[in-house]
């Protein structure tokens, strides 16, 4: 089928849009920490079942100490820090603006790759960073009565949004290091294990995320809140669907998309979530959407696309 990869990439963007909407609902009903714990545990069950079905083991095969270290570190930064900030941003500024700040992930990943891995930082990447930041600025800044620029969103929500994008970007680079180590440790004859390496890597990251969130919950003495959360049917349904459409369907389809089209095209189309989420967020949460915010979201996505040209 012609343009199959492009179609799948658009489906991924839609899937992540649905994930963000359900995550906002779940976070507001259950709490960001509770939502993250439940989502991580559900992710482990789904990923473990997938690995078991195809490889005969629910746990990552052939992953050595180096792979576990780097992928666990990636899970700590990307899930424990990044997702904690992301889900809190949903509570403070909503999933629409939360996803807008996630466009900071590609520039952060580019900078982290340059610093940590010695990767080349092209002029397109630098331009993409400036365009992305401009788009975010257009969306979240207003001129006050004194004609001075000011935030139109709660500062705490903006900081959580920035933390989410930065955490996601750094976590991505650490994940790349971990997957490189993992790939070397898999025997050439184990093609199935090699094909499922992204799922196994996500499993390792999710283990760190789940353990980390449970430790935070224990430190804050909030284990009892999981019982209360389990009784909230709407909140639990939101957590379930956020897990299915995000870590499970979103990840699997994103891996499939790059098999049928160029990675740059797939990445750009999958980055359309900040635009796709505008109308559903307006309908579901009665959020007022201005023309300037739509333009800002479009500019941010254009900035992201420059990283892949």
Tell where the protein language model's regions lie, with residue ranges.
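Alpha-helical transmembrane segments of compact multi-pass small-molecule transporters, enriched
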Residues: 41-46, 101-115, 130, 208, ...
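Hydrophobic core positions of alpha-helical segments in small-molecule transporters
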Residues: 11, 38-39, 101-104, 123-127, ...
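Membrane-interface interhelical linkers
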Residues: 1-15, 20-34, 38-73, 83-93, ...
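Alpha-helical transmembrane segments
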Residues: 74, 119-132, 196-209
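Juxtamembrane helix-loop boundary signature in multi-pass membrane transporters
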Residues: 1-14, 107-166, 170, 176-177, ...
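Alpha-helical transmembrane segments and their membrane-interface junctions
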Residues: 170, 175-177, 250-270
């Amino acid at each position: 089928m012609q343009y199959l990869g492009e179609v799948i990439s658009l489906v991924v963007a839609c899937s992540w849009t649905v994930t963000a909407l359900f995550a906002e609902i779940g976070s507001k009903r259950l709490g960001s920490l509770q939502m993250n714990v439940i989502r991580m545990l559900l992710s482990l069950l789904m990923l473990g079942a997938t690995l078991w079905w195809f490889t005969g083991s629910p746990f990552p095969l052939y992953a050595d100490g180096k792979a576990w270290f780097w992928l666990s570190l990636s899970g700590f930064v990307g899930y424990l820090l990044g997702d904690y900030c992301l889900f809190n941003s949903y509570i403070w500024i909503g999933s629409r603006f939360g996803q807008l700040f996630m466009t900071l992930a590609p520039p952060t990943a580019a900078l982290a790759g340059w610093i940590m891995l010695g990767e080349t930082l092209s002029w397109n990447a630098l331009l993409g960073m400036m365009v992305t930041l401009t788009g975010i600025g257009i969306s979240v800044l207003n001129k006050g009565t004194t004609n001075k620029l000011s935030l139109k969103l709660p500062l705490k929500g903006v900081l959580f949004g920035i933390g989410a994008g930065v955490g996601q970007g750094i976590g991505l680079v650490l994940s790349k290091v971990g997957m490189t180590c993992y790939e070397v440790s898999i025997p050439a004859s184990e093609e199935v294990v090699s094909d499922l390496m992204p799922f196994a890597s996500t499993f390792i990251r999710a283990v760190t995320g789940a353990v980390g969130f449970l430790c935070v919950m224990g430190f804050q003495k909030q284990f009892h809140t999981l019982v209360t959360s389990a009784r909230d049917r709407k909140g639990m349904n939101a957590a379930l669907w956020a897990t299915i459409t995000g870590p499970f369907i979103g990840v699997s389809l994103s891996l499939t998309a790059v098999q049928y089209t160029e990675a740059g095209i797939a990445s750009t189309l999958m980055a359309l979530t900040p635009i796709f989420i505008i109308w559903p967020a307006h309908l579901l949460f009665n959020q007022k959407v201005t023309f300037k915010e739509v333009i800002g979201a479009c500019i941010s996505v254009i900035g992201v696309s420059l990283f892949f040209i």
